[in-house]
Amino acid sequence: MSPIIQSAWGIVYHMSSDWEPRYLLIKRHALSGKIERVAPKGKIQGNEDIQKTALREVSEETGIPINQMRIKQQLGTTQLRNTENQKGQMDKDVTYFLMEYAGNPDFVKIEHAEGYIGIHKRCTLNEVLALIYYQDIRELIRKSYSIIKDGQKNMDIKKDFINKLG
């Protein structure tokens, strides 16, 4: 059995002017040769912790400075196991993080490395759900959307409460 690789993905969003989250996806060539959309991701290097891996990989793959991103929370983990010994497949434990980007999405750029060929900067929830091939990733996107919207509701409740006190 091959070693299990630890990796981290960043489900990255920024808030649009209409207060709806917009997601960042990367386009790449899949092993099948088709173009797929994925979240920025990568492997742990050295003694790096999983959150630092997520921030570093998103920064490396999109050009977003680490200081313009904030991990909101861990969304979940999956175990990917290669039971058929397919070429290019490896055993991985993947940790997913919801990350907020506070900068201008116009400045996000793709690095033409690791097979990446482009970027989608402003995907709505429905666009992401239509573009993402993998069901488990679509579920994480749905979960992230609920977390973001619940956070907005909580902020509105706090503002209303403070206004009533004043």
Model regions and ranges:
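Functional cleft and adjacent loop/helix regions within the main domain
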Residues: 36, 40, 46, 84-86, ...
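N-terminal strand-loop-strand
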Residues: 1-40
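A periodicity- and composition-biased signal for non-globular, repetitive helical segments
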Residues: 33-34, 47, 144, 148
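Residue-level marker of positions within ordered structural domains that often coincide
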Residues: 15, 102, 146
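A generic secondary-structure boundary signal that marks alpha-helix termini
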Residues: 19, 63-64, 150-153
